[in-house]
Amino acid sequence: MSTIRCDIVSAEKEIFHGEATLVVATGELGELGIAPKHAPLITRLKPGKVVVITANGEHLDFAISGGILEVQPQVVTILVDTAVRAQDIEEAAVRKVKEEAERLLANRGNTVDVAEAQRRLTEATVQLQALERLRRNLKH
């Protein structure tokens, strides 16, 4: 089976490095599926999911806060601000962050950084969606 190398990295660390049969990510114009021998491209990624199907068939689900995806003949590189594997997400902590961001946005005052509250809300929502996908996959 043909594979493509996949690297997911942030400014702080390498998050994933391995061979994949398919990489799925949410670009600005919709969902992208990157398979081996895909045409070269570069695009911005929206906050959302990145799913890597490894050479042995394992589905790895990541929640990302946005980034850049680049496809070259032998490698797909995903540069992200933040990324977390669905299985590593602490649901209670994420729900707390989401509720706090929603509260800040609902009670906007002069001291509220709206952009930061919206960023936190988006990031928490993306992580909770990743957890839900993980739970659905575990049921199958």
Curated annotation (Swiss-Prot):
Q: Source organism's superkingdom? A: Bacteria
Q: Which UniProt keywords apply?
A: ATP synthesis, Cell inner membrane, Cell membrane, CF(1), Hydrogen ion transport, Ion transport, Membrane, Transport
Tell me the function of this protein.
Produces ATP from ADP in the presence of a proton gradient across the membrane.
Gene3D superfamilies listed in its UniProt record: ATP synthase delta/epsilon subunit, C-terminal domain, F0F1 ATP synthase delta/epsilon subunit, N-terminal
Q: Where in the cell is it found?
A: Cell inner membrane
Q: What is its main location?
A: membrane
Q: Which family does it belong to?
A: Belongs to the ATPase epsilon chain family.
How is this protein annotated for GO cellular component?
plasma membrane; proton-transporting ATP synthase complex
Give the Pfam families listed for this entry.
ATP-synt_DE, ATP-synt_DE_N
Q: How does it sit in the membrane?
A: Peripheral membrane protein
- UniProt xrefs under InterPro entries: ATP_F1_dsu/esu_C_sf (IPR036794), ATP_synth_F1_dsu/esu (IPR001469), ATP_synth_F1_dsu/esu_N (IPR020546), ATP_synth_F1_esu_C (IPR020547), ATPsynth_dsu/esu_N (IPR036771)
User: Which GO terms label this protein's molecular function in UniProt?
Assistant: ATP binding; proton-transporting ATP synthase activity, rotational mechanism
- Specify the protein name: ATP synthase epsilon chain
Q: Does the keyword Cell membrane apply?
A: yes
Subunit structure, interactors included: F-type ATPases have 2 components, CF(1) - the catalytic core - and CF(0) - the membrane proton channel. CF(1) has five subunits: alpha(3), beta(3), gamma(1), delta(1), epsilon(1). CF(0) has three main subunits: a, b and c.
Q: Which organism is it from?
A: Xanthomonas oryzae pv. oryzae (strain KACC10331 / KXO85)
